[in-house]
């Protein structure tokens, strides 16, 4: 069954997602939990936390400058306990250093906040879904989210899992060609039972919800066979290795910087959140069906080096040049103002966004459409 979308695409798009128990995501969750604790105790904390997980070892490193005290090991275990691990499963090694005084002075001086590093950040939105996110990314994330929700009902399912969705676009029509899921499981369940459970309880309900279900779709569940050993016991995990899963899949560009374990002075995170905030406003207002915002930054500088707004399938009333003018004039682009606008130091629990993508969650501050009315008035004045 083909689903109709507002704006045309052509060709195959493949999107993937991973679950909470994936080794890279375990690391992201620990890093963001440490960040949350630092900000909770001292909002001016500067955090650059990295986590490495392999076999029975969890290693936490990085640079942290804070007036608070965070028990890194205890914070890490809160994440691991939620995934069913016990204290016998891992040993922790902590190698946290203080942030360089040179970096600290460059980032925060004279009541200004400078960019914590150079870099390029990208935000994207499109009209394919109500979340203004690409359909493939939303479906891939929905699959692993649903599988996680039924673990209590089907305890042979474990938290390390991946999904992959192939969508074929022909203009304003899109069809799902295949769904792949690899799901860790206990030893006492047969592959046939696991496959039938995942197909009937996860894949079919999600495809039906998004209007994509079709008997021709190929369902691939654990195509490699049994998947009993998972998590860091099977594969090494590291923070920041799922940047495409965290954002927009194959649908948009990426600046290259990861998010987890970084405080809001790190523009890899803050710039990407703000770029999404802007792109979502543009699409929600009907100025374009698809929008990509790119912002480049210079280390220690409070304002961006460049801002570029690219729009596709633009409303005939407007032009890309006009949209760029309105956006550039309306928003305050300083790092400090972005942090304040998105409430990144007082209303965000970063751990919540370490899995299932950082975008499309309606409760996130960067997903709110607070500036719609003001932008609509401003663009009329420009015309």
Swiss-Prot record:
Residue numbers binding L-methionine: 63, 99, 235, 266
Subunit structure: Homotetramer; dimer of dimers.
GO cellular component term of the entry, any: cytoplasm
Residues annotated for ATP binding in this entry: 22, 160-162, 235, 241-242, 258, 262
GO molecular function: ATP binding; magnesium ion binding; methionine adenosyltransferase activity
Disulfide bonds listed in the record: none
Region annotation (Flexible loop) ranges: 99-109
Pfam families on file: S-AdoMet_synt_C (PF02773), S-AdoMet_synt_M (PF02772), S-AdoMet_synt_N (PF00438)
EC nos: 2.5.1.6
Annotated source species: Mycoplasma pneumoniae (strain ATCC 29342 / M129 / Subtype 1)
Annotated residues for binding of K(+): 50
UniProt keyword terms in alphabetical order: ATP-binding, Cytoplasm, Magnesium, Metal-binding, Nucleotide-binding, One-carbon metabolism, Potassium, Transferase
Compartments reported by the entry: Cytoplasm
Any single GO BP term: one-carbon metabolic process
Residues binding Mg(2+): 24
Family: Belongs to the AdoMet synthase family.
UniProt main location, coarse: cytoplasm
Name of the protein in question: S-adenosylmethionine synthase
Cofactor remark from the record: Binds 2 divalent ions per subunit. Binds 1 potassium ion per subunit.
Function (record text): Catalyzes the formation of S-adenosylmethionine (AdoMet) from methionine and ATP. The overall synthetic reaction is composed of two sequential steps, AdoMet formation and the subsequent tripolyphosphate hydrolysis which occurs prior to release of AdoMet from the enzyme.
Top-level EC class: transferase
Annotated PANTHER family: S-ADENOSYLMETHIONINE SYNTHETASE (PTHR11964)
Pathway: Amino-acid biosynthesis; S-adenosyl-L-methionine biosynthesis; S-adenosyl-L-methionine from L-methionine: step 1/1
Reactions catalysed according to its record: L-methionine + ATP + H2O = S-adenosyl-L-methionine + phosphate + diphosphate
InterPro entries referenced in this protein's UniProt entry, alphabetically: ADOMET_SYNTHASE_CS, S-AdoMet_synt_C, S-AdoMet_synt_central, S-AdoMet_synt_N, S-AdoMet_synthetase, S-AdoMet_synthetase_sfam
Requisite cofactors: Mg(2+); K(+)
């Amino acid at each position: 069954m083909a689903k109709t979308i507002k704006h045309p695409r052509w060709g195959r798009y493949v999107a993937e997602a991973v679950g909470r128990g994936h080794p890279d995501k375990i690391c992201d969750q620990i890093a963001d939990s440490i960040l949350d604790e630092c900000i909770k105790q001292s909002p001016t904390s500067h955090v650059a936390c990295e986590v490495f997980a392999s076999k029975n070892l969890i290693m936490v490193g990085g640079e942290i400058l804070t007036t608070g005290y965070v028990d890194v090991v205890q914070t890490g275990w809160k994440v691991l306990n939620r995934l069913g691990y016990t204290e016998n499963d891992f040993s922790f090694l902590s190698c946290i250093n203080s942030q360089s005084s040179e970096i600290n002075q460059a980032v925060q001086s004279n009541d200004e906040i400078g960019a914590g590093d150079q870099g390029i950040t990208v935000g994207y939105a499109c009209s394919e879904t109500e979340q203004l996110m690409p359909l493939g990314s939303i479906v891939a994330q929905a699959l692993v989210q649903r599988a996680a929700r039924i673990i209590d009902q089907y305890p042979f399912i474990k938290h390390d899992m991946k999904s992959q969705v192939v969508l074929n676009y022909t203009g304003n029509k899109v069809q799902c060609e295949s769904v792949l899921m690899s799901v860790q499981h206990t030893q006492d369940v047969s592959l046939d039972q696991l496959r039938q459970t995942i197909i009937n309880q996860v894949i079919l309900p999600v495809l039906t919800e998004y209007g994509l279900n079709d008997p021709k779709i190929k369902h691939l569940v654990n195509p490699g066979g049994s998947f009993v050993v998972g998590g860091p016991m099977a594969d090494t995990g590291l923070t920041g290795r799922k940047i495409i899963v965290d954002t927009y899949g194959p649908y948009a560009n990426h600046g290259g910087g990861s998010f987890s374990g970084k405080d809001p002075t790190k523009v890899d995170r803050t710039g990407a959140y703000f770029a999404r905030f802007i792109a979502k406003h543009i699409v929600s207002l009907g100025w374009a069906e698809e929008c990509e915002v790119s912002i480049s930054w210079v280390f220690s500088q409070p304002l961006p080096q460049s801002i570029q707004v690219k729009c596709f399938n633009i409303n005939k009333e407007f032009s890309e040049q006009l949209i760029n003018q309105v956006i550039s004039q309306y928003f305050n682009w300083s790092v400090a103002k972005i942090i304040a606008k998105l409430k990144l130091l007082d209303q965000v629990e970063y751990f919540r966004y370490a899995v299932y993508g950082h975008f499309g969650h309606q409760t996130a501050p960067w997903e709110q459409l607070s500036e719609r009315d003001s932008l609509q008035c401003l663009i009329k004045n420009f015309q």
